């Protein structure tokens, strides 16, 4: 397995898809990395030469990826919470941040339903 940005990318997949296993690299960024290095997107990871892997590693390091990106996102959320703005409070309460409705839906953000006992007759 080739190791890029601290992630073992799968050997059997095409390079274009394998790069998306790195946190912060989607299909578009993967294509940009491949275009800048001149590696064919259709090549399998197992067929890459060591020089190609080094080129990919160098190109990937120009972006904020993996742990640094997670830390950056966490710090941005913490900053919002510290200044006490609405977005920060919504993050803290585990509710949708961008104005979505919560009377119905929002199950992903709020978690599973907490069942309340019905009224006895």
Curated annotation (Swiss-Prot):
NCBIfam families: uS13_bact. Signal peptide: none annotated. Belongs to the universal ribosomal protein uS13 family. Pfam families: Ribosomal_S13 (PF00416). It comes from the Bacteria. GO terms for molecular function: rRNA binding; structural constituent of ribosome; tRNA binding. One of its GO terms (cellular component) is cytosol. InterPro entries: Rbsml_uS13_C, Ribosomal_uS13, Ribosomal_uS13-like_H2TH, Ribosomal_uS13_bac-type, Ribosomal_uS13_CS. Residues 99-121 are annotated as: Disordered. Located at the top of the head of the 30S subunit, it contacts several helices of the 16S rRNA. In the 70S ribosome it contacts the 23S rRNA (bridge B1a) and protein L5 of the 50S subunit (bridge B1b), connecting the 2 subunits; these bridges are implicated in subunit movement. Contacts the tRNAs in the A and P-sites. This is Small ribosomal subunit protein uS13. PANTHER family: 30S RIBOSOMAL PROTEIN S13/40S RIBOSOMAL PROTEIN S18, SMALL RIBOSOMAL SUBUNIT PROTEIN US13M. GO terms for biological process: translation. Keywords: Ribonucleoprotein, Ribosomal protein, RNA-binding, rRNA-binding, tRNA-binding. Residues 100-121 have a biased composition (Basic residues). Part of the 30S ribosomal subunit. Forms a loose heterodimer with protein S19. Forms two bridges to the 50S subunit in the 70S ribosome. The keyword Zinc does not apply.
